[in-house]
Swiss-Prot record:
Official protein name in the record: Probable kinetochore protein NUF2
Subunit structure: Component of the NDC80 complex, which consists of NDC80, NUF2, SPC24 and SPC25.
Domain of life: Eukaryota
Lineage of source species: Eukaryota, Fungi, Dikarya, Ascomycota, Saccharomycotina
Assigned GO CC terms: Ndc80 complex; nucleus; spindle microtubule; spindle pole body
Annotated localization: Nucleus; Chromosome, Centromere, Kinetochore
Record InterPro entries: Kinetochore_Nuf2_N, Nuf2_N_sf
MF (Gene Ontology): microtubule binding
Gene: NUF2
Species the sequence originates in: Candida glabrata (strain ATCC 2001 / BCRC 20586 / JCM 3761 / NBRC 0622 / NRRL Y-65 / CBS 138) (Yeast)
Coiled coil spans: 155-304, 349-437
BP-aspect Gene Ontology terms: cell division; chromosome segregation
Swiss-Prot/TrEMBL keywords: Cell cycle, Cell division, Centromere, Chromosome, Coiled coil, Kinetochore, Mitosis, Nucleus
Function: Acts as a component of the essential kinetochore-associated NDC80 complex, which is required for chromosome segregation and spindle checkpoint activity.
Amino acid sequence: MATPTQDIFPLLDLEELVICLQSCDFAMATEEHIARPTSQYVITLYKQIIENFMGISPEQVLAEQLSSRQNTEGNDESTSVDMFDGPYRETLQMLTLNKICYKFFENVGINDFNIVDLYKPEAYRTRRLLSAVVNYARFREERMFDCNQFIIQMEEMLDELKSKFDDFNYLKAQLTAIEDDDEKTPGELEDLLQKNKVLETNLKKLTILQEKLSIDYNNYKMKKQELLRELEKNSFTLIELESKKERLMNYNDDDQDLQNSLNNSIDRLTEEKKKQIGYVSKLEGNVSNLKVTVDTLEKAIEHIYDILRLLSTDLQESHRAELNIEGIKGPLTEKRTRLKNLLESNVIYKYDVLKEQLNVAETEYQRINEEHYRETLENKKLIQELEGKYNNIIHNKMQEAEVYIENEITEKKIKILQSELNDIQIQFNNEIDNIELHYSTLVGHINNYMKKLITALNNH
């Protein structure tokens, strides 16, 4: 038990304590109840205190835990309801209240609060605990105006935190959608790459064919020019021959042989001219067909280039999408790690608090055992002293009135002393049994709670 000199707050007397508590809207605070506290009274008063200063209650915490278990366990909902509504409900409420009170009183300057302060409250400890509450209320009232700025900042940070959680959920949904699309993308990407390879092969073939046709077309143009020059030359020759023919027609008929020879030459040249004209027409038809083929090939090549551009655009978009996915995965993974670390640290903190409370309870139990052992030794010593005194009295009185002492006084005193000793022993044994019963019940509930908590953590 801590002494007043170890506390950071003053120990108030009952009258001042009651006035301060009633000014804080705790109407049930009276001198009589605080001077002789009962378990039911301090439990009700502490519930009002933590609900007023912390804004929570054991029932609310249990309801939230029940709702959380129903959401996470699914089919095991009936088991959770039985655990919270069954015979353990009152015990869970007391453990929850003890945990909340331990944290609250630790914050206001008391580090040795334990469950005994709820089940078997002492007047001095109750007065000390309530003095800490009054000191905290005074400090809170004095510093409330200084905390307005921090309250505003806290609200802004809470709003920002909610916004971040909304952004996180949105990014998580986007990541899920992208991952779903990403599972389908590899197959489509492979198909596009395969089609792209086929189109590239066809494009190479068409490019080679285009080059070959271009060479043939250039050769054709050169040959056409040569034929046109030859045709022009033959035309000039024909014109000259026609001119000569006209001049020769003026000669007399004696030159019939020469005329026949000239006519034959003219016919031969005319026939050759017709052949050249037919060949030129055929070449022009081939050129027209070749132009149509070249135009068709150019259109096909342009179409293939358009397809390649589209494929390149799709590949670039897929690459950008993959980069965006990688960029989003990094922050999301980091946020997930931070949230996981935060949850693990919170669970470890709760486990440490329970472990600390268990250590305090074990220390209190050891102290009670030591007091019991010490009181037992004192009782044995007292019995031995009484027996010694009794023996001395009997020895002295036996010399004076042995028959009277044996029949009357000795039996009467022995019965009275034996009755008193039996009453003291029975009362002491009852107190020890009650303490051991409460301690074993507490340890059992704590073990069950820790097992269920560990099971819940493993399930998560």
